[in-house]
Amino acid sequence: TLQKSGMTRSLKYLRQQTRRITGSYNGHIALRVAQDWSDYLDMAEKVGMNMQLESVMFPLDLKRRHDDLVLERNKRHRMEVMKGAKRSIEKEAEQLEKQFHIENIYKKIRKIYEYDGAEYIIRVPEGAKDILQESKFLDHCIQRGTRYFERISVRESYIFFLRKKSDPNTPWYTLEVEPGGTVRQKRSYNNDQYADLEDAKPFIEEWQQVVQGRMTASEISFAKQSKEIRAQEFAELKENGNIIRTGANAGKLLVDELMHDLMEVEKRVG
């Protein structure tokens, strides 16, 4: 990259992108930015982008452009993987429905939680099959066990889908949501989050307020119980000092990351 673009121009660009992330220059972060830039240029060339353009070689927001290409690459790969997974998903979903009755629960809550905004939508799955398909497409942790299905069955939390309105049938982010709308987790490809999530956060907050106006007495009761369970679990995680072992957050305290990811419902005014 340095040879192709010129040493001075490349170093200046790396400093600019590092400051964009941290507000100042940081050598450790600069190394990560350099790796992202290298990955981005490799992906851009493979998808046929014009590498002679300044805007391609030196994108204004490197992280955003890098993440966009990662998401597109992942989407193409997962579509191929899913072609051979249909039968196994159906078989597994059938067993999960017998055990946890996801379809029946979601029929009761669909009108409370489904919502269309100007650019994004929240979708309530039909049942376990939809959830498994979403998890296998995005390759995140829901598919690896029954924990989240158990939580749905006792109304501790639900699994919903955050989608782009322009592409409503393609998995984007999976949300773990408490009754009432508090979002515990937001996960996309490889159990991760990307720069594009920031654009959707105002919509999530808008949706949370809409949900508050639709709450039933039973859902309010479930929301209170869920909040108490979450507080207890966070306290236990903090006391035990559980560490994340893999991924971008490896080495960090699990409870800190869960608290950072949490989007609690703001109280309605008036």
Which role does the model predict for each range below?
Residues T1-G270:
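Glycine-focused motif/segment detector
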